[in-house]
Amino acid sequence: MRHEIWNEIRQQAPLIHNITNTVVANFSANGLLAIGASPVMADAIEEVAEMTFVSDALVLNIGTLGTMTEATMIRAGQAANEAGCPIVLDPVGVGATSFRRDVVERIMRHVRVSVIRGNAGEIATLIGVDWAARGVDAGDGACEPRQLALEAAKRYGCVVAVTGKEDMVSDGHVVMEVRGGTKRMTETTGTGCLLSAVVGACLAVEKNALKATVTAMSGYAYCGELASERAEGPGDFPIHFLNALHQLTQYTIPTNRIEVSTS
Protein backbone atom coordinates (compact mmCIF):
# COMPACT_ATOMS: atom_id res chain seq x y z
CA MET A 1 0.00 0.00 0.00
CA ARG A 2 1.33 3.42 -0.97
CA HIS A 3 -0.86 6.19 0.43
CA GLU A 4 0.90 8.89 -1.65
CA ILE A 5 -0.94 7.54 -4.68
CA TRP A 6 -4.06 9.48 -3.66
CA ASN A 7 -2.17 12.77 -3.62
CA GLU A 8 -0.57 11.97 -6.98
CA ILE A 9 -3.98 11.31 -8.54
CA ARG A 10 -5.20 14.69 -7.34
CA GLN A 11 -2.05 16.41 -8.61
CA GLN A 12 -1.95 14.71 -12.02
CA ALA A 13 -5.70 14.33 -12.73
CA PRO A 14 -5.17 11.26 -14.94
CA LEU A 15 -7.64 10.64 -17.76
CA ILE A 16 -9.44 7.33 -17.16
CA HIS A 17 -11.21 5.90 -20.20
CA ASN A 18 -14.18 3.78 -19.12
CA ILE A 19 -16.06 1.48 -21.45
CA THR A 20 -18.56 0.54 -18.82
CA ASN A 21 -22.17 -0.42 -18.30
CA THR A 22 -25.15 1.89 -18.46
CA VAL A 23 -26.21 1.16 -14.88
CA VAL A 24 -23.07 2.57 -13.27
CA ALA A 25 -21.59 5.11 -15.69
CA ASN A 26 -22.73 8.17 -13.73
CA PHE A 27 -21.67 6.79 -10.34
CA SER A 28 -18.29 5.72 -11.71
CA ALA A 29 -17.67 9.12 -13.29
CA ASN A 30 -18.58 10.94 -10.07
CA GLY A 31 -16.38 8.60 -8.02
CA LEU A 32 -13.39 9.25 -10.26
CA LEU A 33 -13.98 12.99 -10.05
CA ALA A 34 -14.18 12.68 -6.25
CA ILE A 35 -10.64 11.29 -6.03
CA GLY A 36 -9.30 13.85 -8.49
CA ALA A 37 -9.18 11.78 -11.68
CA SER A 38 -10.75 12.80 -14.99
CA PRO A 39 -13.29 10.31 -16.40
CA VAL A 40 -14.29 9.81 -20.01
CA MET A 41 -17.00 7.34 -21.07
CA ALA A 42 -16.40 6.93 -24.81
CA ASP A 43 -17.80 3.69 -26.22
CA ALA A 44 -18.29 4.32 -29.95
CA ILE A 45 -16.10 1.89 -31.87
CA GLU A 46 -15.17 4.68 -34.28
CA GLU A 47 -13.34 6.65 -31.58
CA VAL A 48 -12.26 4.31 -28.78
CA ALA A 49 -8.75 3.73 -30.09
CA GLU A 50 -8.11 7.45 -30.51
CA MET A 51 -9.53 8.17 -27.05
CA THR A 52 -7.44 5.42 -25.48
CA PHE A 53 -4.23 6.80 -27.00
CA VAL A 54 -4.68 10.01 -24.99
CA SER A 55 -5.81 8.27 -21.78
CA ASP A 56 -3.77 7.24 -18.75
CA ALA A 57 -5.73 4.05 -18.01
CA LEU A 58 -8.50 1.99 -19.62
CA VAL A 59 -11.29 0.27 -17.67
CA LEU A 60 -13.35 -2.42 -19.44
CA ASN A 61 -16.62 -3.40 -17.73
CA ILE A 62 -18.96 -5.94 -19.38
CA GLY A 63 -21.99 -5.25 -17.18
CA THR A 64 -24.39 -4.39 -20.02
CA LEU A 65 -23.11 -6.14 -23.13
CA GLY A 66 -24.36 -4.98 -26.51
CA THR A 67 -23.78 -6.26 -30.01
CA MET A 68 -20.74 -4.01 -30.53
CA THR A 69 -19.29 -4.18 -27.01
CA GLU A 70 -16.80 -6.96 -27.67
CA ALA A 71 -15.32 -5.39 -30.81
CA THR A 72 -15.20 -2.00 -29.12
CA MET A 73 -13.38 -3.33 -26.07
CA ILE A 74 -10.88 -5.30 -28.14
CA ARG A 75 -10.12 -2.27 -30.31
CA ALA A 76 -9.64 -0.05 -27.25
CA GLY A 77 -7.62 -2.74 -25.46
CA GLN A 78 -5.25 -3.23 -28.37
CA ALA A 79 -4.76 0.54 -28.60
CA ALA A 80 -3.97 0.58 -24.88
CA ASN A 81 -1.44 -2.23 -25.31
CA GLU A 82 0.20 -0.33 -28.15
CA ALA A 83 0.36 2.86 -26.08
CA GLY A 84 1.53 1.19 -22.87
CA CYS A 85 -1.69 2.20 -21.14
CA PRO A 86 -2.72 -0.02 -18.16
CA ILE A 87 -6.02 -1.92 -18.43
CA VAL A 88 -8.48 -3.04 -15.76
CA LEU A 89 -11.02 -5.71 -16.74
CA ASP A 90 -14.21 -6.07 -14.70
CA PRO A 91 -15.94 -9.27 -15.92
CA VAL A 92 -19.35 -8.43 -14.45
CA GLY A 93 -21.65 -11.47 -14.33
CA VAL A 94 -19.31 -13.55 -16.46
CA GLY A 95 -20.69 -16.73 -14.93
CA ALA A 96 -24.31 -15.84 -15.69
CA THR A 97 -24.37 -16.75 -19.40
CA SER A 98 -22.24 -18.49 -22.00
CA PHE A 99 -22.34 -15.27 -24.06
CA ARG A 100 -20.53 -13.38 -21.32
CA ARG A 101 -17.99 -16.15 -20.83
CA ASP A 102 -17.22 -16.27 -24.54
CA VAL A 103 -16.84 -12.49 -24.79
CA VAL A 104 -14.39 -12.36 -21.88
CA GLU A 105 -12.39 -15.27 -23.29
CA ARG A 106 -12.03 -13.48 -26.62
CA ILE A 107 -11.10 -10.18 -24.97
CA MET A 108 -8.40 -11.94 -22.95
CA ARG A 109 -7.15 -13.66 -26.09
CA HIS A 110 -6.59 -10.38 -27.92
CA VAL A 111 -5.78 -7.94 -25.09
CA ARG A 112 -3.16 -7.98 -22.30
CA VAL A 113 -4.77 -6.65 -19.15
CA SER A 114 -2.99 -5.34 -16.07
CA VAL A 115 -5.65 -6.16 -13.47
CA ILE A 116 -8.79 -8.29 -13.34
CA ARG A 117 -11.21 -7.20 -10.61
CA GLY A 118 -14.29 -9.25 -9.83
CA ASN A 119 -16.27 -11.00 -7.14
CA ALA A 120 -15.55 -14.59 -6.15
CA GLY A 121 -18.13 -16.05 -8.52
CA GLU A 122 -16.75 -14.12 -11.49
CA ILE A 123 -13.13 -15.06 -10.82
CA ALA A 124 -14.10 -18.69 -10.20
CA THR A 125 -15.78 -18.80 -13.60
CA LEU A 126 -12.66 -17.47 -15.30
CA ILE A 127 -10.55 -20.36 -13.98
CA GLY A 128 -13.20 -23.07 -14.36
CA VAL A 129 -14.06 -23.58 -10.69
CA ASP A 130 -17.63 -24.71 -9.99
CA TRP A 131 -19.57 -21.85 -8.43
CA ALA A 132 -23.25 -21.19 -7.79
CA ALA A 133 -23.29 -17.62 -9.08
CA ARG A 134 -26.58 -15.70 -9.17
CA GLY A 135 -26.64 -13.28 -12.09
CA VAL A 136 -24.08 -10.58 -11.30
CA ASP A 137 -23.98 -11.54 -7.59
CA ALA A 138 -21.10 -13.57 -6.16
CA GLY A 139 -23.11 -16.62 -5.06
CA ASP A 140 -21.41 -19.49 -3.22
CA GLY A 141 -18.64 -22.00 -3.81
CA ALA A 142 -16.14 -24.23 -2.03
CA CYS A 143 -12.87 -22.58 -3.12
CA GLU A 144 -11.33 -19.94 -0.87
CA PRO A 145 -11.05 -16.38 -2.30
CA ARG A 146 -7.32 -16.48 -1.53
CA GLN A 147 -6.86 -19.50 -3.78
CA LEU A 148 -9.09 -18.04 -6.49
CA ALA A 149 -6.98 -14.88 -6.68
CA LEU A 150 -3.71 -16.82 -6.74
CA GLU A 151 -4.76 -19.33 -9.41
CA ALA A 152 -6.36 -16.69 -11.64
CA ALA A 153 -3.26 -14.48 -11.42
CA LYS A 154 -1.07 -17.42 -12.42
CA ARG A 155 -3.32 -18.35 -15.32
CA TYR A 156 -3.67 -14.89 -16.81
CA GLY A 157 -0.29 -13.44 -15.89
CA CYS A 158 -1.72 -10.31 -14.31
CA VAL A 159 -2.85 -9.02 -10.94
CA VAL A 160 -6.22 -10.39 -9.84
CA ALA A 161 -8.44 -8.86 -7.16
CA VAL A 162 -11.27 -10.90 -5.64
CA THR A 163 -13.70 -8.74 -3.67
CA GLY A 164 -16.49 -9.70 -1.31
CA LYS A 165 -16.63 -10.73 2.34
CA GLU A 166 -12.88 -11.27 2.01
CA ASP A 167 -10.85 -9.08 -0.36
CA MET A 168 -7.80 -10.77 -1.87
CA VAL A 169 -5.21 -9.51 -4.36
CA SER A 170 -2.54 -11.64 -6.01
CA ASP A 171 0.14 -11.31 -8.67
CA GLY A 172 0.60 -15.08 -8.84
CA HIS A 173 3.40 -15.06 -6.27
CA VAL A 174 1.97 -13.40 -3.18
CA VAL A 175 -1.58 -12.99 -1.94
CA MET A 176 -2.56 -9.88 -0.02
CA GLU A 177 -5.72 -9.74 2.08
CA VAL A 178 -7.23 -6.28 2.38
CA ARG A 179 -9.36 -5.96 5.50
CA GLY A 180 -12.22 -3.54 5.99
CA GLY A 181 -15.31 -2.43 4.13
CA THR A 182 -18.96 -2.62 5.05
CA LYS A 183 -22.07 -4.58 4.10
CA ARG A 184 -23.65 -1.31 3.01
CA MET A 185 -21.45 -1.42 -0.08
CA THR A 186 -23.48 -4.41 -1.28
CA GLU A 187 -26.72 -2.46 -0.90
CA THR A 188 -25.80 0.17 -3.50
CA THR A 189 -25.44 -0.72 -7.16
CA GLY A 190 -22.15 0.13 -8.80
CA THR A 191 -19.75 0.06 -5.85
CA GLY A 192 -17.79 -2.83 -7.34
CA CYS A 193 -17.72 -1.21 -10.76
CA LEU A 194 -16.50 2.07 -9.28
CA LEU A 195 -13.77 0.17 -7.44
CA SER A 196 -12.50 -1.12 -10.79
CA ALA A 197 -12.41 2.46 -12.07
CA VAL A 198 -10.53 3.59 -8.95
CA VAL A 199 -8.01 0.79 -9.50
CA GLY A 200 -7.55 2.22 -12.99
CA ALA A 201 -6.87 5.68 -11.55
CA CYS A 202 -4.28 4.25 -9.16
CA LEU A 203 -2.63 2.36 -12.03
CA ALA A 204 -2.38 5.60 -13.96
CA VAL A 205 0.08 7.00 -11.40
CA GLU A 206 1.62 3.78 -10.00
CA LYS A 207 2.92 1.28 -12.55
CA ASN A 208 3.33 -1.52 -10.00
CA ALA A 209 -0.07 -3.16 -10.51
CA LEU A 210 -0.05 -5.06 -7.21
CA LYS A 211 0.79 -1.95 -5.20
CA ALA A 212 -1.76 0.16 -7.09
CA THR A 213 -4.55 -2.39 -6.63
CA VAL A 214 -3.94 -2.95 -2.92
CA THR A 215 -3.80 0.81 -2.33
CA ALA A 216 -7.06 1.30 -4.23
CA MET A 217 -8.86 -1.45 -2.34
CA SER A 218 -7.61 -0.39 1.09
CA GLY A 219 -8.57 3.26 0.64
CA TYR A 220 -11.89 2.31 -0.93
CA ALA A 221 -12.82 -0.02 1.93
CA TYR A 222 -11.90 2.63 4.48
CA CYS A 223 -14.14 5.17 2.75
CA GLY A 224 -16.95 2.63 2.82
CA GLU A 225 -16.60 2.29 6.57
CA LEU A 226 -16.66 6.06 7.08
CA ALA A 227 -19.71 6.43 4.86
CA SER A 228 -21.52 3.63 6.68
CA GLU A 229 -21.01 5.40 10.02
CA ARG A 230 -22.55 8.59 8.63
CA ALA A 231 -25.35 7.18 6.48
CA GLU A 232 -28.86 6.40 7.68
CA GLY A 233 -29.51 3.87 4.94
CA PRO A 234 -28.84 2.88 1.32
CA GLY A 235 -30.36 6.13 0.06
CA ASP A 236 -27.76 8.49 1.46
CA PHE A 237 -24.85 6.02 1.61
CA PRO A 238 -23.64 6.87 -1.93
CA ILE A 239 -23.53 10.58 -1.02
CA HIS A 240 -21.42 9.98 2.09
CA PHE A 241 -19.26 7.52 0.17
CA LEU A 242 -18.44 10.03 -2.58
CA ASN A 243 -17.68 12.63 0.09
CA ALA A 244 -15.31 10.20 1.82
CA LEU A 245 -13.53 9.49 -1.46
CA HIS A 246 -13.15 13.22 -2.02
CA GLN A 247 -11.51 13.59 1.41
CA LEU A 248 -9.33 10.49 1.09
CA THR A 249 -6.03 12.39 1.03
CA GLN A 250 -6.81 13.72 4.51
CA TYR A 251 -7.15 10.29 6.13
CA THR A 252 -4.50 8.12 7.72
CA ILE A 253 -5.38 4.57 6.74
CA PRO A 254 -4.12 2.01 9.30
CA THR A 255 -1.30 -0.10 7.87
CA ASN A 256 -2.43 -3.22 9.73
CA ARG A 257 -5.29 -3.69 7.26
CA ILE A 258 -3.04 -5.66 4.90
CA GLU A 259 -1.93 -9.28 5.42
CA VAL A 260 0.59 -10.84 3.03
CA SER A 261 1.13 -14.54 2.32
CA THR A 262 3.26 -16.31 -0.30
CA SER A 263 2.08 -18.97 -2.73
From Swiss-Prot:
The lineage of its organism: Bacteria, Bacillati, Bacillota, Bacilli, Bacillales. This is Hydroxyethylthiazole kinase. It is an enzyme of class 2 (transferase). ATP binds at residues 117, 163. Its cofactor is Mg(2+). Keywords: ATP-binding, Kinase, Magnesium, Metal-binding, Nucleotide-binding, Thiamine biosynthesis, Transferase. Substrate binds at residues 41, 190. CDD domains: THZ_kinase. Pathway: Cofactor biosynthesis; thiamine diphosphate biosynthesis; 4-methyl-5-(2-phosphoethyl)-thiazole from 5-(2-hydroxyethyl)-4-methylthiazole: step 1/1. GO terms for cellular component: cytosol. Its EC number is 2.7.1.50. GO terms for biological process: thiamine biosynthetic process; thiamine diphosphate biosynthetic process. Belongs to the Thz kinase family. It comes from Exiguobacterium sp. (strain ATCC BAA-1283 / AT1b). Catalyzes the phosphorylation of the hydroxyl group of 4-methyl-5-beta-hydroxyethylthiazole (THZ). It catalyses: 5-(2-hydroxyethyl)-4-methylthiazole + ATP = 4-methyl-5-(2-phosphooxyethyl)-thiazole + ADP + H(+). One of its GO terms (molecular function) is magnesium ion binding. Pfam families: HK (PF02110).
